[in-house]
Design a protein with these regions (language model features):
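Structured, active/binding-site neighborhoods that engage oxygen-rich ligands
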Residues: 1-270
């Protein structure tokens, strides 16, 4: 029932967004997590990624929050993708259910990624993920929602200078037979493209929350992050009540997490 950096950084973002969108405030929460062990199950930060660590070091050295993120090809780990989901609810509260029609909404996604991961490839992963997540809250069937979310994000990026060159890395997601790929061809390491692919593949190949998360874990490699990213989507599709009670019962600091989530919900819906 313990949890790692994925959950901690997601809670950091949700807590900060409760007070509105402030990039410095988000980074200060990340620092509180890394330096003081806040937003953790046992009072100390666990398993921080290298790109995130470097970004926080730059912040401490005086860099502006939006100048901290790594922007080289080697900075495309899954560290911004794994924490981005709370932003969906903020964007819907500001721009409405069709936030993906707004360039400004994508700009916010990219900036929240860029706090730690500023390369266009990581930003695209976050954009696709948030677009798919938004569609899962609608009435469409699973496959339709996923395809429409991917399609809307691709549509946006195809017209964006600097991003269009990176789209080729996401070609497999556009393939109508993507869900039918065998598990051996799904990579589940720390590379952001692999993590996004694995999460969507697990979602498309299962029919409930529990099976989706277990499939992600069973892919091996970066299991906590792939399961967190896949579980985020499955949670939106199947709802809170679909999470197995025996899993919820053993979560460390469950009341703390639920209270922070409630605070976030009330802040963005008031």
């Amino acid at each position: 029932g313990t949890w790692s950096d994925d959950t901690s950084m997601t809670l950091c973002l949700a807590d900060s967004l409760s007070r509105g969108l402030n990039y410095n405030d988000i980074m200060q929460n990340f620092l509180k997590w890394f330096k003081k062990g806040e937003f953790t199950p046992f009072g100390s930060a666990f398993d921080i990624g290298n790109t995130t660590r470097q970004a926080l070091k730059r912040l401490e050295q005086g860099a502006a929050p939006l100048e901290c993120g790594g922007n080289t090809e080697y900075d495309n780990g899954n560290g911004s993708l794994m924490r981005i989901l709370p932003l969906l609810f903020y964007l819907q509260s500001v721009y409405g259910r069709e936030f993906y029609q707004e360039d400004e909404a994508f700009a916010v996604i990219h900036k929240v990624s860029a706090l730690t991961h500023a390369h266009k490839r990581s930003q695209i992963a976050c954009g696709i993920y948030i677009a798919v997540a938004g569609m899962l809250l609608g009435e469409m069937n699973l496959k339709e929602a996923v395809n429409l979310g991917i399609g809307k994000a691709m549509e946006y990026y195809q017209n964006q200078e600097g991003f269009v060159e990176e789209l080729k890395f996401y070609n497999r997601l556009k393939d109508k037979d993507f869900a039918d790929l065998p598990s051996e061809s799904i990579r589940s390491g720390g590379y952001v493209v692999s993590t996004l692919e694995a999460a969507i593949w697990c979602l498309l190949n299962t029919e409930n929350y529990k099976d989706c998360v277990l499939k992600a874990v069973n892919l091996g490699s970066d299991t906590d992050t792939v399961a967190a990213v896949a579980g985020g989507l499955a949670g939106l599709k199947y709802g809170y009540t679909a999470i197995p009670q025996d899993w919820l019962g053993v979560i460390v600091k469950r009341e703390y997490i639920e209270s922070l989530c409630n605070q976030f919900y009330f802040a963005i819906t008031r």
